[in-house]
Amino acid sequence: YGPRYSPDGSRVVYSRQGGGGLTGSLWSGSRGVFVMPAAGGESVEIAGNGADPQFSADGERVYFLTGGGLEKKLMSAGLHGEQPREVFNLKYVDHVAISPDGRSVAFTELFNGYVAPLPATGGSIELNKDTKALPVTALGTDMGSYLHWAADSESVHWMVGDRYHSRALAASKPDAGVPVGLRVDSDAPDDTFALVGGRVVTMRDADNSEEVIEDGVVIVRGKRIVAVGKRGDVAIPAGAREVDVAGKTVMPGIVDVHAHAAHFGQGVVPQNNWAYAANLAFGITTMHDPSATTEFVFSQSELVKAGKMVGPRVFSTGTILYGADGDFKAEVNSLDDARSHLRRMQANGAFSVKSYNQPRRDQRQQINQAARELGMLVVEEGGSTFQHNMTMVVDGVTGIEHNIPVAPLYRDVVELWRQTDVGNTPTLVVNYGGLNGEYYWYAKDNLWENERLNRFFPKNSLDENTIRRQAGPEWDYYHIEVAKAAKVLRDAGVPILVGGHGQMQGQAPHWEIWSLNQGGFTPFEALRAGTIDGARYLGLDKEIGSIEAGKRADLVVVDGNPLQDIRRSDDTALVMVNGRLFKADDLSEIGGKQRPAPEFFWQRGGGGVPTGVNYGPTVPCHCPKSDPHRH
């Protein structure tokens, strides 16, 4: 990772890191910082751990980062076996760039950039924007990523979204930025499909009717639905590929609005994501991740949009606007602070932000106001804090993620909430206040025997979360009580959405739908929560969420009838996203590019096992970024 040339171009320094949840652990045994000849040859270990290495101005030492979180250090080591020594204690600083002339250091701290002299001292110094040990100059606000120096050490560059920014040290402020201008065509299928003979659950005008078309026909041309109706009422175009779906149910693809999907990473971006495949195979065609590494998740999303990777539509808030402590916290003490954070996230591709446990109400209100000005959504972390939740409802956020930590809910809460447009994603699989819903569903099925999960899920991760299961008596599963409270809210007009929380990729959104049914939602109402209601929550209902002419062709074909037995919702036979049709059992493509079933690292000889990933009860869903220098 992070190879860099020495000043004279004769050597390259790089770090070796371990594997990850998307790449496996093969070749993870030898980690650290290494130097090798630029022309090729043997590598020499400089340090046993570290990341982001860079040469000193004379090429005789290497700087690198160690630690993680609030306990990071910038170290330096010679090229001939000298013991590494500390240069800076970093705490809130998350990126350091030494100038080519060795005289200055640029760094980012809590999403702002600074520059200071590089001292020639023998001891370690605390580096931060408020240090008294060095004169520190702010580079600008709305800072982004990839901070680096110009070759002459007279200016600093960085990226914010697709704009390349520069600040000359002699200038009073940064330039306006130059758009990089990289454009890639989005995937555009040109097939025409006719799905014939199935039961079509359209979710059209689903608040007022429960439209089901028996012996229906759905015509898809390219990436859009062009017609839907009964057989005989809809003409099948000449040349269309007819797909017999008699005896099956055709419904909109599932929209998971709270979908954590292995989106924490740095460095090389994997070009295959088994979490995407698992979700798509189970009929999830849209995912919204409300906590992810910004650069990583939007890179993955763009690979899907360009057709370079198979998966659902992927949207995200990027890194959360964290209100507690950490080197990624978002300090919000004014409306301008909030605007700065939201501008940065919007530039990177977010249309939503996650306001996460900002402790003061005025801070949360400032984020809300900035979002209104910028046309963005705000999804609030529920945080198991009832009093905060009620102020969130009053202040008018887009929605609250996770359940209200008390149930049942009484009339005062319901009457207050129904007068707003604030939604709720209860994430019953990880509900607050009692035994989680996921434990209930783990106990009901032998998931380690599920053929589809075994194809799309790393075997060791699947087994460790499904074989030895925690269980309790039926009355102890609190998610059912929470689901009943959600039903009361929905009957009062409060949008209730489906969020699988990444607990079991692909399967968890169905658990969420089934849990809503346990709370009193009819099968249609539970499916509505996972389709058109989710699309409306994300502001995407004009494009997805129902089967209507003109909308994007995101569909799932289910064996059986989930309107009669909601547990059939995960029995997917075919799935279509953006007009591309796949067999659900292996995700081989029908028509179009005719791509074969995807292959994953654990299916190859010596592919290793995933590391740094835990699905199920210990899912790490709010880590802001990976810590490649923590070992």
Whereabouts are the PLM-identified features?
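A flexible loop/linker signature enriched in serine peptidases of the S9 family
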Residues: 1-2, 6-34, 38, 42-75, ...
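Histidine-rich, glycine-flanked metal-binding segment
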Residues: 206-251
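C-terminal recognition in membrane/secretory proteostasis and scaffolding
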Residues: 69-70, 74-76, 80, 86, ...
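Divalent metal-dependent hydrolysis catalytic cores, especially in the metallo-beta-lactamase
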Residues: 275-295, 311-322, 346-358, 368, ...
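Metal-associated gating/positioning segment near the N- to mid-region
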Residues: 249-306, 326-327, 336, 362, ...
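Acidic, glycine-enriched loop/beta-strand segments at the rims
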Residues: 201-217, 230-232, 507, 522-527, ...
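Conserved blade-ending motifs and adjacent loop-strand segments that build the rim/top face
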Residues: 88-93, 129-148
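Active-site neighborhoods of metal-dependent hydrolases
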Residues: 341-359, 403-519, 524, 592-594, ...
